[in-house]
Amino acid sequence: VVAVYSQPLIVDSSITPTEIVQNTLVGSGITPTNIKFNKSLSNALITRDQIGVFTNGQGTNLGLASGVVLSTGQVQYAGGPNNQNGASHPTLIPIANDADLALLSSNSIQNIATVEFDFVSTGTEIGLDFIYASEDYPEYATSSFSDVMGIFLSGPDIAGPYSNNAKNIALLPSTSIPISTNSV
């Protein structure tokens, strides 16, 4: 019998949210501005334990080799195992409200991790690969604890029910159902 183990994600939270957006989240041909982390321009200029970049994804079942990780807890524990005291809570006081995320859940939002920015693209199309994971899944699926995910896009010719007429593009495949621990 040969046992093969996945290699853990490598997570780096020593980079500011602004640097993460500029150097990892957006690609060539996209210029981001007005970068905010948890509703604040100044929060985006210092390192935070709720956002980081990951590498070594090819050693896991994620389907992405590298990218950005957001957490309502501490991203350093994102690779698991899920056995760390305090991993579910950021070291700073979390922000607990977001009008758009609140529309995605019938339950109250307890804490959030948000990155917001404006961008201009030189192309006619943009793409984004994302993966949703929750420490609350599957233990709290169909309960009053419901982690939600939203990716809100607004701009010319976009008309949606969220702030700035945005649409949520974080939906279950081929549906209009928002992604949450209660919907996956």
Model-identified regions with their sequence ranges:
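Aromatic (Trp/Tyr/Phe) and Gly/Pro-enriched flexible surface segments
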Residues: 4-184
